[in-house]
């Protein structure tokens, strides 16, 4: 690890932000701090993550939503002080890292399948076979 990476990792730990582990295809709610005149409020921006850029302190992600029939994309810096919180609403099952093809689609063709959690019975059976193999 070079000096710049070390400084960035120290800065990330100093910020103490808890960023959930999300990926492209996930539906997230980003709570953004907005200043209007002398008032400060939190604005929720809900949409699908279409891209994620992992660059340490300079990491960013792009969220797309359809508002009044128009597609709106917004790019957020992951460690920005303007982001109050990030909440994952739904996990999406996609096979691409960048979902830019969603820009050309609308309606049913723009839907993303939901990633279902592994069944408990399947996990128990898998754990049981691993224990018998180790014995």
UniProtKB/Swiss-Prot annotation:
Q: Which Pfam families match?
A: Ribosomal_L19 (PF01245)
Keyword presence, Protein transport: no
Q: Where is the composition biased (Basic and acidic residues)?
A: 108-117
CC annotations in GO: cytosolic large ribosomal subunit
Listed A to Z, the keywords are:
Ribonucleoprotein, Ribosomal protein
Superkingdom as given in the UniProt entry: Bacteria
Question: Which portions of the sequence form the region Disordered?
Answer: 108-135
Classification via InterPro entries: Ribosomal_bL19, Ribosomal_bL19_CS, Ribosomal_bL19_sf, Translation_prot_SH3-like_sf
Q: Name one GO molecular function term.
A: structural constituent of ribosome
Task: Tell me the GO BP annotations in alphabetical order.
Answer: translation
The family annotation for this protein states: Belongs to the bacterial ribosomal protein bL19 family.
State the function annotated in the UniProt record: This protein is located at the 30S-50S ribosomal subunit interface and may play a role in the structure and function of the aminoacyl-tRNA binding site.
Q: What name does this protein carry?
A: Large ribosomal subunit protein bL19
Whose protein is this, by species? Nitrosospira multiformis (strain ATCC 25196 / NCIMB 11849 / C 71)
Q: What is the lineage of its organism?
A: Bacteria, Pseudomonadati, Pseudomonadota, Betaproteobacteria, Nitrosomonadales
């Amino acid at each position: 690890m070079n000096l710049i990476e070390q400084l960035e990792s120290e800065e990330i730990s100093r910020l103490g932000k808890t960023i959930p582990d999300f990926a492209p295809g996930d539906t997230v709610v980003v709570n953004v701090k907005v200043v209007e005149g002398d008032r400060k409020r939190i604005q929720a921006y809900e949409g699908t993550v279409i891209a994620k850029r992992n660059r340490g302190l300079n990491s960013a992600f792009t969220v797309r939503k359809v508002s009044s029939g128009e597609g709106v994309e917004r790019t957020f810096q992951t460690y920005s002080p303007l982001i109050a919180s990030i909440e994952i609403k739904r996990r999406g099952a996609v096979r691409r890292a960048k979902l830019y093809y969603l820009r050309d689609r609308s309606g049913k063709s723009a839907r993303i399948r939901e990633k279902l959690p592994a069944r408990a019975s399947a996990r128990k059976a898998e754990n049981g076979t691993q224990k018998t193999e180790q014995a």
